[in-house]
């Protein structure tokens, strides 16, 4: 499988780039975290599997989602919201892995937000579908 970061030029040794007020492209920043994040993702999804949520209008979202941390983002007929309880398991969302926290706080610091402390993480899984 091709490396998406290489295709997009995100792994290249180039300086960070401000792309809009308050938004910075941190090329290659996450690469040192990949192995730890993927391992931790397996632990998170074992407790809170990916699912296709429903919009308030009844459409099933194409992206599969899960959450970790103190709250999780939800979408269903009742609307969009954050909740501390996973509606599919009836339990709290899994704790946010330390490597997720390190990635988020490091990226925020490099982007100019040194005081950022992550408390929730929405994880999206996009899958390729052939048109038609």
Stretches found by the model and what they are:
Residues 1-132:
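Non-heme Fe(II) oxygenase metal-center motifs and adjacent flexible, charged/small-residue loops
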């Amino acid at each position: 499988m091709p490396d998406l970061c290489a295709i997009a030029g995100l792994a290249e040794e180039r300086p960070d780039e401000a792309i809009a007020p308050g938004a910075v492209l941190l090329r290659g920043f996450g690469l040192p975290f990949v192995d730890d994040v993927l391992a931790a993702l397996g632990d998170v999804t074992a407790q809170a599997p990916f699912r296709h949520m429903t919009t308030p209008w009844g459409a099933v979202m194409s992206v599969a989602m899960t959450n970790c941390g103190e709250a999780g983002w939800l979408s269903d007929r009742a609307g969009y919201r954050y909740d501390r309880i996973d509606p599919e398991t009836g339990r709290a969302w899994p704790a946010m892995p330390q490597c997720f926290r390190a990635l988020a706080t490091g990226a925020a610091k490099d982007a100019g937000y040194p005081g950022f402390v992550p408390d929730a993480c929405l994880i999206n899984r996009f899958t390729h579908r052939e048109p038609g």
